[in-house]
Amino acid sequence: MEKGILKSVIAVAAIITSIILITLTLSVCSNNSASFTGDVVATTAATEIKLTDGLGKEVVLDKPAEKILVFAPSALEIIDGLNAMDAVIGIDNWSVDNKEPLAEGFEGFGDFQTLNMEKITAAAPDIIIGLAGCAEADIQKLTDLGIKIYVVDANMIDEVYMEIINMGKILGKDTEARELVDELKKQVEGISSKVAGLTEDKKPKVFYEVWNEPLMSAGKNTFINDLIEKAGGINIVAADGLEGWPEYSIEKLIQNNPDIIIAPVSLAPDVSTIIEDRRFSSINAVVNKKVYVVPDNPTTRPSQNIIKGLTMFAQAIHPEIFGEFSVQQ
């Protein structure tokens, strides 16, 4: 969800930038849009580690990394899930400034647009972890200096599995990574299997509101669409053939008349923000009070915590199967 949000809404007001930083997770990487493969390439030596990152670039390490700079909160969550935080020597400024839960005790090594080159080179990290989207010139300079960079670029839940596996390879935590993936797959399949047999007429139409003016939503090839579909809903924007994070007219919204509206808390502090929007007054979701506000992080960050987002979407879309909606941080 991530690089697409950056390209679509970076010029929109500060809150959308916050969504981008969460959905794009403060990356330090290239603006290239090569498709994600995440393949773990067979090693050519006993200690050599070869990976293909989210931009399709090969990354080679002589041994598991012991000093890592992390400029993507999603990657930091994965590292925490692998019990490998002792390998992290620094993170991004945004996470420090916004007191992210995992940021305590760490120094910032750069912001979203500009990296602290002097500080980074002095730290001599074994590798930098980030996401596609920003600081291209700085990243090239670091590459020229021989600093390894692994770019995370996962847009679907299935791609999160490979990111976890690759983080395990980088950290020498292969077993822990496989166990984390197995547990995550089990939880995801536990939800998706319960709605897999539903006919189309039993799947509620869902609209995810990314931004209100202009009205923006999530289409194909986004985490949000993946969550909606795996939770047994129909994303009306994806159904219209739109990809990424497009603008969506109020006329089209009224025409498609979604049964459910979901929005991030960074856009709507509570459901009244949406329910009281006069443009939505005739929409089924508003009339029937099927409007839900979800926290940003577990619905947009490509880590094992995405299961919390999927659970909330499932409860919002099919409470008769998954129980009453409950916010999960």
Predicted ranges, named:
Residues 161-162, 166-169, 178, 182, ...:
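Structured C-terminal subdomain patch of bacterial secreted/periplasmic proteins
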